[in-house]
Amino acid sequence: LDRIRRILTQNYVRPDESERIKSKIRDLRTYTIIDKVTAKVDEYRDIHVATFSNLAIDPVVMPDEFVREYPKMLSDGMWCIMQMEYFRLEDELEDELADIFDEPRKPRSVPKRNAGPEDNPFKIANLTPIQMPRLDLDSIIGQRERFTTEEWIDLLLRSAGYEPAGMELRTKLHFIERMVPLIERNYNLCELGPRGTGKSHIYNEVSPYAILLSGGQTTTANLFGRLNASPRHATSMERTGLVGNWDCVTFDEVAGMHFKDTNAIQILKGYMAGGTYARGRESFSADASLVFEGNINDSVHNVLKTTHLFDPFPPEFNEDSAFFDRIHCYLPGWEIPKMRSDLLTNHYGLITDCLSEFCKEMRRRDYTHHIDGFFRLNSDFNTRDEIGVRRTFSGLMKLIFPDENIDKEDARMILEYAIEGRRRVKEQLKIMAGVEFMDVNLGYVDAENPADARIVFVAEQADETLIPEAPLQPGHVFAIGRSIDDEYAVYKLEN
C-alpha cells in the first residue's frame, strides 16, 4: 500500500499540475505518468493517435502494437501507467559528418509543414494498463454455479462497497436494483427517499460508464447534442450528447431539473419511450439508461394523504403524467437504511473494474423472455407496463442469475419485485390522472396452473387498506364475524 501511495503521489497527473509534469518530462527526457489515454485512427496520416485526460499536450502517436493489444483504448479510453519520452525531430537530424572536420554538430533545419502527431516531441515509449483491458465474460458467468443465490447477491453487494450482513432480502434487492440501469439498456429508474441513503454511490463511484449530474442541472444540448452539429468537425459529445456517450445518466436531484428549452421535456419523453431523438434534421438512437433521484422531506404516509410520490419533481414535470408513465420502476428509497459505517464492507469482492465491465458486457444480452417460461402477465398490463416489468426482470436476472439457470420460485421473487416497482408508478399516475390509469392491479398467472393468479401490491398503500381493492385469489375471501369475546372482527379465509 505504501508503494501504491508513493506511485500515485509521484506519477498521477493532476489537471492543475499538467504543465509541471510536461516540464519534468522535457527535463528528464523520460518520465512515468498515470493518466487515462484514448486512442483513435487518423485516417489522413494512417496512424493511431492518443489523447490524455489530464496531461494537456497535443495528440501524440500511439504505437500500433499497444492498440492491437488493448483495443479498449479505441472506445472508452483506459487508465494506464505510461513511460513518456521527450525528443525533438531536430535532435535526430544532426549532421553526422560534422565531427570529421572537428566542427560542432548543428541540427539540420526541419522542412516547414503543418505540425502533426508525428512532430510532437512527447512520445509513448511503454504502456501498462492499470484497469482491466478486457473481460472474459463467459468465465465470470461460469463461476455463478459455485455460489448459492444468497452468496452471489452478497458478492455483488460487497463488490459495490456494501456490507450485506444483517440485511433482509428485500433491502438487498433494493441495492441490487440500483445496479439495473448499468446492466440494462434504455432503462428508466426513479428513486426518491430520505437524504443520506447513498442514492448516488453506485453511479458516482462504481462504474466509469455512468455520469452523475449534480443538482440535476443540464441543458438540452448537453443531454442530446447540439443542433445540426457537423459530423466531421464536431466531437461525439457535441453530436449525440450525454445519452450517446454514457451507459447511464443520473439526475442527482430531481427538484433542480429545469430546462430553458421548452421542447426539452418532449425530447426527453421521446427518448425514454423509444431510445431515439432528433436534433435538427438528424435522428439519433442511443441506449443510455436514465436515473432520477431526489429527496422526500416527509413520511410516505403523510405525502400520500395530500399528494403523490412524484411530488419532488419540478412543476413542469408534475403536470405531465405521460413523462412519469415512461418510468419503468420506482425504487422506494424510504425503505433503504441511511448509510453508516457498518453498512460499508471490509470484505473481499470483485474489483470495481470487473463489476463495471461485467455490467457493460451484459448490456448486450436480453433476458426479458425468461418470464414466459414460468408465468403470464395478467390483463391489467398495458404495453408500457409490460416493457417496464420485463426490463426490470431482465436486469435483475442478469445480475443475480447471469448463467440463466433460474428456478420457478427465484423467477417469482424477482418478477414480483419488478411488478411492484411498476405498480408504484401506476398508483401515482392514478392519483394524478384518475380514470386513465385505473388498471393498477398488476399481477401474473402461473403458466402451468392458470388457476393460480396473483396480484402484487405496493407496501405503502396496502398498509392503509384493510381489504385490498383488487380481486382476490381463488379460494380467498374476507368476512365479518363475531369473536369468542362477542366482538365484531374482519377475517380472511384461505382455502
Residue locations for each model-derived region?
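Conserved ASCE/P-loop NTPase catalytic core
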Residues: E163-N302, T307-D311, D325, A447-E460
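Charged, alpha-helix-enriched surfaces in structured cytosolic catalytic cores
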Residues: D16, R20, T32, F147, ...
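Phosphate-sensing "switch" segment of ASCE/P-loop ATPases
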Residues: S283-L290, N295-I400
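Terminal-proximal interaction/regulatory segments of ATP-powered molecular machines
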Residues: V435-D439, G443-V477, D486
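Eukaryote-specific, cytoplasm-facing alpha-helical/coiled-coil scaffolding segments in long proteins
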Residues: E205-S207, D353-E357, I419-E427
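Basic/aromatic-rich interaction segments and small domains that mediate binding to polyanionic partners
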Residues: R482-N495
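C-terminal helical "lid" subdomain and adjoining coupling/linker elements of P-loop NTPases
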Residues: S341-L343, H369-Y444
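Extended, charged/polar low-complexity intrinsically disordered regions
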Residues: L1-A160
